[in-house]
Amino acid sequence: MFNYYRKEIEWGGRPLVLETGKIARQADGAVVVTYGDTVVLCTAVGARSVKPGQDFFPLTVNYQEKAFAAGKIPGGFFKREGRPSEIEVLNSRLIDRPIRPLFPENFRNEVQVVATVLSHDLENDPAIAALIGCSAALTLSGIPFFGPVAACRVGYADGAYILNPTLPEMKESALDLVVAGTSEGVLMVESEASELSEDVMLGAVTFGHEAFQAVIDAIISLAEHAAKAPWDLAEPSAEEIALKQRIDTLGRAAIAEAYQERVKQQRYKKVGAAKEAVLAALATEGLDVTAAKPILKDLEADVVRSAVLDTGYRIDGRDLKTVRPIVSEVGILPRAHGSALFTRGETQALVVATLGTAQDEQVIDALEGEYRTNFMLHYNFPPYSVGECGRMGSPGRREIGHGKLAWRAIHPLLPGKDTFPYTMRIVSEITESNGSSSMATVCGTSLALMDAGVPLKRPVAGIAMGLIKEDRGFAVLSDILGDEDHLGDMDFKVAGTESGITALQMDIKITSITPEIMKIALGQARDGRLHILGEMSKALTEGRSDVSSTAPKITTISVPKEKIRDVIGQGGKVIREIVEYSGAKIDINDDGTIMIAASSEDQATRAIERIRGIVAEPELGAIYTGKVVKTADFGAFVNFLGARDGLVHISELAQGRVAKTTDVVNQGDVVKVKVLGFDDRGKVKLSMRVVDQQTGADITESVGERPGRPAR
């Protein structure tokens, strides 16, 4: 019944198993990947025909995590998986980026790749297993695919690289790097690092590329037994070849002339006009205008790429290494806690920092368990930033991915909660875009956080590198434009400080690049990053000495652990009363640390005094101001130290004989009392008789102590 095949290898100290032929047999390709006890089902399905008028490659990658994989039931009212989580979106992109360049250039059939996490052992990352499985599924499917591709995760600790570190090991690693590629070279890199050098980062990429060669061999071995017959790819017809030559004759010179314009919007108009002229000419000649559009795109790319390689100059007139002009401004929004406007050429980011309390932390429900984060970065790319009309709404995959890249760049430089107990939210609004908006977000975020008074260890900057590679040579471009990104072969983003790299993301549009090119790009990126940091320093070089006057002021105090219950009170009654009385927000940790967030010093003082009053122990002989909370025949109960009450015996109410308690005090009276001692149950014995009720002075010597009662 099953045409089952299995391939197992030892990889990174545990078995990696690839299986096919038992599950999802109606998909073009289906592979179950098991790594440790993490299991991922990966499928690939392709449409056999192209939709009419299709002029792009419709590849969709969906990575999905099932709650049952970790023995959990989804939360919420419906108790089932809903919209993709952030990690699902990020891992979908992680799989998409290395496989997309490996389809034939003119392939337009719809392809859908799905990775479903079926089991998660809470040690082995399902994203790596998913990427390997999707590559294997495509390799087996018969869909035109120039793979296989494989991937691994690389850590770095104690001067050594770690292959596929477990989730607990990642907590001790100075590097979290994912590298993917073919047997020939690297296709994709994604990383977060603790200010590591270019040599260490390049070494990690090389280490990873060598490490996953065994996986590529395993996929090939599985394909030798289980692969389906490859699809036939139609060769270009004589008519298509003739059409391409005709378009080249009609359009090359006009498009090259249009690209002499250095202002983006004007250039787009001229290039668009040149293309329309070519299409109009083809229509009058009776040629296929629909088929001509993708050929025109290829011609446009060839014109731009050839100009860079032939002249060493780019669309906007810069040489290969020059960074566009930079203007940095901070404190531009009066009520924001921190703000910055970072402009680099025709790319601009308005970045705003908001400070909150522990109550504002984001709670993330992941397969690994629920955890909290006090740093959020949200990247928005409205259509007006490129002069277009478009959809406005929830963030798309690209916005989530760009925001996470900037988050990785900044995260290693943030202060610890013990020194800066704030929750930080960053919003980056891209107000203009002509390439490298995610790196503008990194620069703007660094400035906005420092403007908000966040003590960053060092400022962070980012730069996007590009590549033009042909048989006759290559050129590495610094600070690429949008057109250079679209028409080039590489988008290589590098962020870091003057001390080292904190984030790196590389996407390749060709089959691979060499270590030589990566080394040149990293060196050129370092020069560009240091230049950008110098320009940013003209606005701000370090965090302001204090947070904004509009931000909450957080004060941290500690109380004994055994006193936490007293501060909270039964059912939270006491803490609610303190919040209502002071107007401050209060967070209590299990270790006895209490964080008080207040909009004014008075609010903080009121909350601190009330808490200290609750946890303080009465001092023998000390005098306190209190309030009578209850009267009885034998005396009065006085609340004198936070929530603590004590008894003033009727004999200690006044100097003379007192016949009735209410002759001296009534409920609600404010009185001054002295601590005389404690009974055998710890109850406090108080006296009003030995305290001057006007001045609060101790008058024991003048009135004398009350003699004790004779023994019965």
UniProtKB/Swiss-Prot annotation:
Protein residues bound to Mg(2+): D485, D491
Database matches in PROSITE patterns: KH_TYPE_1, S1
Catalyzed reaction equations: RNA(n+1) + phosphate = RNA(n) + a ribonucleoside 5'-diphosphate
SMART domains recorded: KH (SM00322), S1 (SM00316)
Entry keywords, A to Z: Cytoplasm, Magnesium, Metal-binding, Nucleotidyltransferase, RNA-binding, Transferase
Molecular function terms, GO-annotated: 3'-5'-RNA exonuclease activity; magnesium ion binding; polyribonucleotide nucleotidyltransferase activity; RNA binding
The encoding gene: pnp
Stated role: Involved in mRNA degradation. Catalyzes the phosphorolysis of single-stranded polyribonucleotides processively in the 3'- to 5'-direction.
EC number: 2.7.7.8
UniProt keyword Metal-binding present: yes
Cofactor(s), by name: Mg(2+)
Domain KH: start-end pairs: 552-611
Sequence ranges assigned to domain S1 motif in this UniProt record: 621-689
Main location: cytoplasm
Name of the protein described by the UniProt record: Polyribonucleotide nucleotidyltransferase
Gene source species: Gluconacetobacter diazotrophicus (strain ATCC 49037 / DSM 5601 / CCUG 37298 / CIP 103539 / LMG 7603 / PAl5)
Superkingdom of origin: Bacteria
InterPro entries: ExoRNase_PH_dom1, ExoRNase_PH_dom2, ExoRNase_PH_dom2_sf, KH_dom, KH_dom_type_1, KH_dom_type_1_sf, NA-bd_OB-fold, PNPase
